[in-house]
Amino acid sequence: MKYKVVIAYDGTGFSGWQYQENAVGVQQVVEEVLAYLEGEPVRIFGSSRTDAGVHAKGFVGHFRLTKPIPPKNLVRAMNSRLPESVRILKASYAEDRFDARQIGRAHV
């Protein structure tokens, strides 16, 4: 099952969105929670990348789970395990053709 999520995060203390070997990115903490829920590694694809210390509101990502979880339950489950600085604002099922990397972006 493919999901779309809308994420908000305070980038303070993070190396940016993208996973990095020697630092903690937001992607890493989200993927750790998804792996916990799925029981195996899950890759999330984000709509863009942010630099270290940059905040995001309305950041979009997509991923696949083999164990279906209703979107409202997914939001609650993820937020219960994520740090307070990272929140899942909304989750929904996504069409197979949806790709968060291909949507528009705006910087403020």
Model-found features: residue ranges?
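Structured-RNA-binding interfaces characteristic of tRNA pseudouridine synthases
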Residues: 1-107
